[in-house]
Amino acid sequence: LECHNQQSSQTPTTQTCPGETNCYKKQWSDHRGSRTERGCGCPTVKPGIKLKCCTTDRCNK
C-alpha cells in the first residue's frame, strides 16, 4: 500500500507501507490554525480530531 505522508499543506510525498491495509488523514485545529497529518495505518484519535481511513493507494490526499 502507498500512502501520502506530508503534513498540512506541504508538497505531497508518499511512503510505502508494508503489511498495512489503511492510509489515514487526521485534521484538527490549534493555535497555528488548521492542521493535517497523513500516514500509514488507522490510528486511534482523541475527541475533536477528524479521522479518515481508506484502503487504496494514495487515497489520503
UniProtKB/Swiss-Prot annotation:
Signal peptide: none annotated. The keyword Secreted applies. It comes from the Eukaryota. Expressed by the venom gland. Gene3D superfamilies: CD59 (2.10.60.10). Disulfide bonds join 3-23, 17-40, 42-53, 54-59. One of its GO terms (molecular function) is ion channel regulator activity. One of its GO terms (cellular component) is extracellular region. PROSITE patterns: SNAKE_TOXIN. SUPFAM superfamilies: Snake toxin-like. Transmembrane segments: none annotated. The keyword 4Fe-4S does not apply. It is found in: Secreted. Keywords: Acetylcholine receptor inhibiting toxin, Disulfide bond, Ion channel impairing toxin, Neurotoxin, Postsynaptic neurotoxin, Secreted, Toxin. CDD domains: TFP_snake_toxin. Belongs to the three-finger toxin family. Short-chain subfamily. Type I alpha-neurotoxin sub-subfamily. This is Short neurotoxin 2.
